[in-house]
Amino acid sequence: MLGMLRWTTAGESHGQALVATVEHMPAGVPVTKDEVTYQLARRRLGYGRGARMKFEQDKLTFLTGIRHGLTLGSPISIVIGNSEWPKWTTIMSSDALDMEDPENVAAMSSGRGAKLTRPRPGHADFAGMLKYGFDDARNVLERSSARETAARVAAATVARSFLRETLGVEVLSHVVSIGRSEPYEGPTPTFADITAIDESPVRSFGKEAEASMITEIEAAKKSGDTLGGIVEVIVEGLPIGLGSHISGEDRLDAQLAAALMGIQAIKGVEIGDGFEEARRRGSEAHDEMVRDEDGVYRTTNRAGGLEGGMTNGETLRVRAAMKPISTVPRALKTVDMATGDAATGIHQRSDVCAVPAAGVVAEAMVALVLARAVLNKFGGDSLEETTCNIRCYLERIGKRLEFNDGE
């Protein structure tokens, strides 16, 4: 849609750089490299991350769209350089290689340059090789790698700043469970708890749940296996009316679900109590409304802050389920695409568990979708104009909920 907030990423896992582009962000939104660096560092958090996290440091460049720490309203480009690029210049070269050069022949015939012909079950390798006509799975896995999410986190840092400046809201996440660990079932955390969550080695908000998750990760390590889990994203303070009931594509819950399902390895999404709602009677499932001197509020929040595709003023709660990482140290059965013979899946440097990081990526996608919804509702070429539009809307909503008391 013309004028809609858009974000795209480019780049390969072992390429020269990843690039994040954000279009139609209003002018005047503050953005700093320190904030982007902070969010990228959060993405690397987590017990069970592999040694590659020590290598994949993030070198930032603001290429376009930002001047003196403020957005210009023009397309924003953020470049994340690959610190390991010198090791990959031949293997990932964009130029054709001279295969009469002995050095090129040596680089491409062994080690990391050798063709990868044994697709990993659960990964994009097999379908990607067939769909695009590749005889080397590297042409698939370089882009399908979760390393790409670093660019999304960078793009979302701009969206986070926009939400903070316009609505005063923050996006946070925590890990609910990992594998078969005992799930966290305590009170919903708030943004005031983010430091405690990030200091947890598994980004858990409960010590008992944390201990159970760590035990599960250690067991998976010992058995040469990998783990998935469930993360929850929480946003407090959203105004009533983001999204719409008018059409399916306008529904905010549909947009959030699509964005979260677009994260590598995510296999399920639920809003609020989600699938548990299907087990309840109608009298138990919905959030009743009451009114006091402060306005209308809900006695529960089973809907997770969304009804009819729109925010209803309650806390937004969205959960995403991540499957176990596809690169399993105890390699799984596959077929060698070069010979048709039985084989085991290729092994790439990987993690045992990336669920804590998935929460940060989920935050990023929720922030981007919410920023788009805010701009669709309130417009504005500048931060000042958008904020003014929001203020007028909130005043109108507030007056509507006064019900002409005293008149």
Swiss-Prot record:
Q: Which GO terms describe its cellular component?
A: cytosol
Q: Which domain of life is it from?
A: Bacteria
Cofactor(s) named in the record: FMNH2
Function, as annotated, reads: This reaction introduces a second double bond into the aromatic ring system.
How, per the record, is the cofactor bound?
A: Reduced FMN (FMNH(2)).
What is this enzyme's EC?
4.2.3.5
What class does this enzyme belong to in the EC scheme? lyase
Q: Which GO terms describe its molecular function?
A: chorismate synthase activity; FMN binding
Keywords of this protein's UniProt record, alphabetized? Amino-acid biosynthesis, Aromatic amino acid biosynthesis, FAD, Flavoprotein, FMN, Lyase, NADP
Q: How does it assemble?
A: Homotetramer.
Its Gene Ontology biological processes? amino acid biosynthetic process; aromatic amino acid family biosynthetic process; chorismate biosynthetic process
Protein name in the entry: Chorismate synthase
* Amino acids binding NADP(+): 43, 49
The pathway where this protein functions is: Metabolic intermediate biosynthesis; chorismate biosynthesis; chorismate from D-erythrose 4-phosphate and phosphoenolpyruvate: step 7/7
Q: Which reaction does it catalyse?
A: 5-O-(1-carboxyvinyl)-3-phosphoshikimate = chorismate + phosphate
InterPro entries noted in UniProt: Chorismate_synth, Chorismate_synth_AroC_sf, Chorismate_synthase_CS
What is the scientific name of the source organism? Answer: Corynebacterium efficiens (strain DSM 44549 / YS-314 / AJ 12310 / JCM 11189 / NBRC 100395)
Task: Tell me its family.
Answer: Belongs to the chorismate synthase family.
Q: Which residues bind FMN?
A: 143-145, 264-265, 308, 323-327, 349
Query: Gene3D superfamilies recorded for this chain?
Result: Chorismate synthase AroC
Question: Which residues are listed as membrane-spanning?
Answer: none
A Pfam family that the UniProt record links to this protein: Chorismate_synt
